Amino acid sequence: MKDVILRKIKNNLVVSCQAVGEETLNNDIAITLMAKACLEGGAKVLRLSQYSHIKSIKSISGKTPIIGLIKSNYENSEVIITPSIKEVDLLLSLNVDCIAIDATNRKRPSETLEVIFKYCREKSPNTLLMADCATIDDVKNADKLGFDLIGTTLRGYTKETFGKSNMDNDYSFIKECLSSIKTPLIAEGGIWEPYQVKDLLDLGCFAVVVGSAITRPKEITKYFLKALDN
């Protein structure tokens, strides 16, 4: 089962279709229509967040592989992406193909990353696990733990990596990751141009995730206006 899903993800564009908080598209109908439009455009894999959004989108997505996560805010932790077993259980109940988990070395609200990983493996051994990382140490640790996929998702989103991008210095961080691990690497974060997707696949990335540049109209508009200002 895992191999079938991995084959569907390999060498593909993964479209991240998410909306949280005060974002205009943060309702089930809007985000489902956005996902439907992406599927009509040819998207073969979706990365989705939030229980009700995933449940709604699954009703129209057929056999499209879904990488699922739940963003939750806890007062005692900066970890937001699937931070505890509580979120894991919700995702397992949705039967997503892959669960994305924050795999940074930051303090978690309850269970450690190792405990969550073990829980997932025991509870649902056929569900893929993706480690969302920010640093090379995160990446190496996720590789050691045995994650099925490792993503560069959180590069630039932690205090340690603030101001850094996966696109810096001709993809130097991506290249370092690729040379350091055997686990399939998914490039994610800061990707705004089609040529970058091709570059990253040519470098050896297993797949590439694009979100804002496709599914966040507000950010796309700001991107174009910034170009005009420059």
Swiss-Prot record:
Pathway the protein acts in: Amino-sugar metabolism; N-acetylneuraminate degradation; D-fructose 6-phosphate from N-acetylneuraminate: step 3/5
GO terms classed as biological process: carbohydrate metabolic process; N-acetylmannosamine catabolic process; N-acetylneuraminate catabolic process
Major enzyme class: isomerase
Keyword Ribosomal protein: no
Keywords: Carbohydrate metabolism, Isomerase
Entry EC no(s): 5.1.3.9
Entry-linked InterPro entries: Aldolase_TIM, NanE, RibuloseP-bd_barrel
Listed CDD domains: NanE
Record's catalysed reaction(s): an N-acyl-D-glucosamine 6-phosphate = an N-acyl-D-mannosamine 6-phosphate
UniProt-listed SUPFAM superfamilies: Ribulose-phoshate binding barrel
Pfam families linked: NanE (PF04131)
Gene Ontology MF terms in the entry: N-acylglucosamine-6-phosphate 2-epimerase activity
GO CC field: cytosol
HAMAP family with a match to the protein in the record: ManNAc6P_epimer
Annotated family: Belongs to the NanE family.
Cited function: Converts N-acetylmannosamine-6-phosphate (ManNAc-6-P) to N-acetylglucosamine-6-phosphate (GlcNAc-6-P).
Protein name (record): Putative N-acetylmannosamine-6-phosphate 2-epimerase
Gene that specifies this protein: nanE
